[in-house]
Amino acid sequence: MKVEELPFSLEQLRILKAIATEGSFKKAAESLYMTQPAISLQIQTLEKKLNIALFDRSGRRALMTEAGHLLLRYGDCILALCEETCHALEDLRNLQGGTLVIGASQTTGTYLMPRLIGLFRQRYPQVTVKLHVHSTRRISWNIANGQVDLAVIGGEVPHELQESLTITPYAEDELVLILPKSHPFAKLESIQKEDLYRLKFIALDAQSAIRKVIDKVLAQNGIDSNLFRVEMELNSIESIKNAVQSGLGAAFVSVSAIAKELELGILHWCRIENITIKRMLSIITNPNRYHSQAARIFSEEILTMFSLQSPEVKKRALSIIQNT
């Protein structure tokens, strides 16, 4: 039997339940703010469609038949599920439940998102948050395919997806040069750009989003990174930091990735004179997909915390997440 062909309605199930609860048609009508004739008509219509008697009317009182009790039992389950569904939807609207799936590129997913998610969960503890960390390219395709609700990335969205996704910048992320504490340059606050050719480098894979940003900015300032002495290429920021700490070379990393190391004094970072390497951090969403209330609020909180129009707000936000 198809749903559209069901011989009963939710309203009729509510009436049947009210009759069983109140003990009579009259009291059921009063509890439902209906007239008794209206109640009787609904039950008669229901019996006709079911082709079975729900009440025995041979005595002074109408008594529920076996069929009536059977329908009542299943009707109670149906009404309970309907009520549960309404509560679940209401919970989602009020951020009292549901799941938020967030995508993030490697650096933002490792160092920034756990803190932001922690702050979000303090306010909305009933929302389950799932974080998927991959390359910017893969996360962008996850958004396009509807596998994640929103993503926070530090690289460029693949060209073939830029027209189909909504890209919202929210902050700038500075990429800095880190050195072992034992390196002679560790005593300096800044170095000349020519000094870069004297360093041994630990680098990310050439296809990584950060590597592309670094190479592009350096090239714009007359520095050919292809001439650097790259001792090794690694695929994670953590392994790069460990290699630098071990004295194997220098590296460019996001400043957000070294807060702990700077606090402990186990790494040094210095500027390159007259050169600042920055990249834009962005929230990406798919305008053709449904955006949950949780996803919208999470995005809004990021935009508020990292307001590009207010350096003071941004500074305060960075302080909050680094000390969380």
Curated annotation (Swiss-Prot):
Biological role: Trans-acting transcriptional regulator of RuBisCO genes (rbcL and rbcS) expression.
InterPro entries: LysR_subst-bd, Tscrpt_reg_HTH_LysR, WH-like_DNA-bd_sf, WH_DNA-bd_sf
PANTHER family: HTH-TYPE TRANSCRIPTIONAL REGULATOR, HTH-TYPE TRANSCRIPTIONAL REGULATOR CYSL
Source superkingdom: Eukaryota
Ranges in coiled-coil conformation: none
Designated name of the protein: Probable RuBisCO transcriptional regulator
Organism: Cyanophora paradoxa
Family assignment from sequence similarity: Belongs to the LysR transcriptional regulatory family.
Any one GO CC term of the record: cyanelle
Keyword hit for Lipoprotein: no
Subcellular compartments: Plastid, Cyanelle
HTH lysR-type domain span: 8-65
GO molecular function, one term: DNA-binding transcription factor activity
Matching PROSITE patterns: HTH_LYSR
Pfam families assigned to the protein according to its UniProt record, in alphabetical order: HTH_1, LysR_substrate
Keywords of the record: Cyanelle, DNA-binding, Plastid, Transcription, Transcription regulation
Location, primary (coarse class): plastid
Segments of the chain annotated as binding DNA: 25-44
